[in-house]
A protein has these predicted regions:
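Acidic di-acidic motifs
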Residues: 13-17
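Conserved beta-strand segments of alpha/beta enzyme cores
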Residues: 32-34, 76, 100
Length: 182
């Protein structure tokens, strides 16, 4: 059995919705969690502390500004959104350095996205496309047919640059189809 790569990881969770923070705390109970519900408190924590990762809401807490801080400090960030779910925010998050872009409807798999990110980083894969491969059918259903056509250059470069590895699935015995709430 694989050891839990999340155990003891320092994770900053940022969201303006208390129920989202509580849900994430429950999902990531093996991690050392800190939370922030405003831009100001999150900015202060990001600038003064060291984290293994940050999970950032896009809308209510100026997530893109926080992503820039996290990227500058080399803190891997996963973007979490409901109201900001759009092709533009998805590509914008990646351009600013986000390691993943997770719709809030997929919140119950946040541990999988984090485990995958940490495992692949250990293997030297900094630009993983696994999260996108897992969520591509969701994005296709949500954004509609041809949604990537608006930014063909970006998505073509993404496909060339971001690696997809089966290492995570083998290590954690995760099926390609995970259960999601929509």
């Amino acid at each position: 059995m694989a050891t839990n790569i999340l155990e003891g990881k320092r994770i900053l969770l940022v969201d303006d919705e208390p129920d989202i923070l509580e849900t994430l705390i429950g999902i990531l109970d093996e991690c050392d969690i800190e939370t922030a519900s405003t831009f100001e408190s999150a900015k202060k924590l990001l600038e003064s502390k060291v984290y293994d990762a940050a999970v950032l809401d896009i809308m209510g807490v100026r997530g893109f500004d926080l992503l820039e801080i996290a990227t500058r400090k080399k803190i891997p960030a996963l973007m979490l959104t409901a109201h900001g779910l759009s092709p533009e925010n998805l590509s914008g998050s990646i351009k600013l350095g986000a390691k993943s872009y997770v719709p809030k409807g997929k919140i119950y798999d946040m541990d999988i996205f984090l485990k995958e990110m940490f495992l692949l980083q250990e293997k030297g894969i900094e630009k993983s496309g696994n999260w996108f491969a897992r969520l591509s059918s969701f994005f296709d259903n949500h954004f509609g047919h041809g949604w990537k056509d608006k930014d063909k250059r970006f998505w073509s470069e993404f496909d060339k640059t971001y690696q997809v590895s089966s290492e995570f699935d083998r290590t954690y015995q995760v099926s390609k189809e995970t259960t999601y709430l929509f």
